């Protein structure tokens, strides 16, 4: 049909070339008069087209063909009937549609070059680079990146996949969100196409799956992923996964799957510190072609402490209002523009919330955490809570001391220094600190 090539040409102008090549060019169109059917070689492509492109395809086909009714199906476009031969012939068996190697769904924008490194993510960055340079190496296969949302886990995953493709353009790298794996498996079960579902994974060089915590409680999904994992691991194909917490903390994940995930390298991605947050704001501003003064970047970094997405949201709001009003971006302009956002951020992480989170984490009563008792089981969690209050809020040392049953500001200062010193040598305390930071940043 003429409308589909014209539609595809318009889509090529609107979407990244790799996306068009991966998801849209494999489609074959059949005009049925009252509707148009787009055939995809496998269920993965059907799911992606339905989720990401179908509304725009309907708009374009309605414009070019006067018909916006579009259906998606797995298979290939039926051939036009051929003239019957003069002599009867025995019909041949229909040929199955050939499997098309999965080309991957990688966002090419995310690279190692534009990832801002800091103390909170430097180990994750190093691990992702190693996985891209030596895919399948048992030292980092699987590579599991875990931490709260918006900290850069998916950026590192995409960057590793893009680096793999850059080193070997023929490499087949598959990226899926966990719910896409689940949806594709359900569709394959309904279509009695599990063999095709499994073959997709046999053809790839690297598998990247986001947010595996959503596998929890889905027994059949975990069963299929378990076998997929084993096949890829045995074939030395690289596996990179993300999770919002350490997998052993995810209720509903099968013990054998948790064991498999521990075979390689697991790395925590923590909320960025002040210096990293400021560097991220400046880097994101440059990407947008916006010039912002350092003191504005420092303001945003000081106030927005939870994750990178919040930093980007604040920056986008600031740049958009500056463009709309024609005003220069200054500290005063930023404070005015982001006033409500900054107030909400401060309310989300307050000293009472920190105290309750620390008390719950260590199994303490709030009255004990705030008491004058100085036993080690109480003093250490109390010091951690004070240090977190200094790290995550704008309160002064005297204000923090007042919130802890009227303690002196020198007690708070000592607690902050003590915790910082102890974390250098005490791995368990460092782990507690990082877990509490993640909980408070969620």
UniProtKB/Swiss-Prot annotation:
Single GO term (MF): DNA replication origin binding
Annotated compartments: Cytoplasm
Any one Gene Ontology BP term: DNA replication initiation
InterPro entries associated with the record: AAA+_ATPase, Chromosome_initiator_DnaA, Chromosome_initiator_DnaA-like, Chromosome_initiator_DnaA_CS, DnaA_C, DnaA_dom, DnaA_N_dom, DnaA_N_sf
Residues annotated as binding ATP: 150, 152-154
Region named Domain IV, binds dsDNA: 323-442
Keywords from the named record: ATP-binding, Cytoplasm, DNA replication, DNA-binding, Lipid-binding, Nucleotide-binding
Free-text domain note: Domain I is involved in oligomerization and binding regulators, domain II is flexibile and of varying length in different bacteria, domain III forms the AAA+ region, while domain IV binds dsDNA.
Protein name: Chromosomal replication initiator protein DnaA
Provenance organism: Xanthomonas euvesicatoria pv. vesicatoria (strain 85-10) (Xanthomonas campestris pv. vesicatoria)
Organismal lineage: Bacteria, Pseudomonadati, Pseudomonadota, Gammaproteobacteria, Lysobacterales
């Amino acid at each position: 049909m003429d409308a589909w090539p014209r539609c595809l040409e318009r889509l090529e102008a609107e979407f990244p070339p790799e996306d068009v090549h991966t998801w849209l060019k494999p489609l074959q169109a059949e005009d049925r008069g009252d509707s148009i059917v787009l055939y995809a070689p496998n269920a993965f492509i059907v799911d992606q087209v339905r989720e990401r492109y179908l509304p725009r395809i309907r708009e374009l086909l309605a414009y070019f063909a006067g018909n916006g009714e579009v259906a998606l199906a797995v298979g290939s476009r039926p051939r036009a009937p051929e003239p019957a031969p003069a002599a009867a012939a025995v019909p041949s068996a229909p040929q199955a549609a050939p499997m098309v190697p999965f080309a991957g769904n990688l966002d090419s924008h995310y690279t190692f070059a534009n990832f801002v490194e800091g103390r909170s993510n430097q180990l994750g960055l190093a691990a992702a680079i190693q996985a891209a340079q030596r895919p399948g190496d048992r030292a980092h296969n699987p590579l599991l990146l875990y931490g709260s949302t918006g900290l850069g886990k998916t950026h590192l995953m995409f960057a590793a996949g893009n680096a793999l493709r850059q080193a070997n353009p023929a490499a087949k790298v598959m990226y899926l969100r966990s719910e896409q794996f689940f949806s594709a498996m359900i569709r394959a079960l309904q279509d009695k196409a599990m063999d095709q579902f499994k073959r997709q994974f046999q053809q790839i060089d690297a598998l990247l799956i986001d947010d595996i915590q959503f596998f929890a409680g889905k027994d059949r999904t975990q069963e299929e992923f378990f076998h997929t994992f084993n096949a890829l691991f045995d074939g030395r194909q690289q596996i990179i996964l993300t999770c919002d917490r350490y997998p052993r903390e995810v209720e509903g994940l099968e013990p054998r799957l948790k064991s498999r995930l521990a075979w390689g390298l697991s790395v925590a991605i923590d909320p960025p510190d002040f210096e990293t947050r400021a560097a991220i704001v400046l880097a994101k501003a440059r990407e947008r072609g916006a010039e912002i003064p350092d003191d504005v970047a420092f303001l945003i970094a000081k106030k927005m402490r939870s994750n990178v997405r919040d930093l980007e949201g604040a920056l986008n709001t600031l740049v958009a209002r500056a463009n709309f009003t024609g005003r220069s971006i200054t500290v005063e302009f930023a404070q005015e523009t982001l006033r409500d956002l900054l107030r909400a951020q401060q309310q989300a992480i307050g000293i009472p919330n920190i105290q309750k989170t620390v008390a719950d984490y260590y199994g303490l009563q709030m009255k004990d955490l705030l008491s004058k008792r100085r036993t080690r089981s109480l003093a250490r969690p109390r010091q951690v809570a004070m240090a977190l209050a200094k790290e995550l809020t704008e309160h002064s040392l005297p204000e923090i001391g007042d919130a802890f049953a009227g303690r002196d500001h020198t007690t708070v200062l000592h607690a902050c220094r003590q915790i910082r010193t102890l974390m250098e040598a005490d791995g368990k305390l460092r782990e507690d600190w990082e877990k509490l930071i993640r909980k408070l940043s969620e």
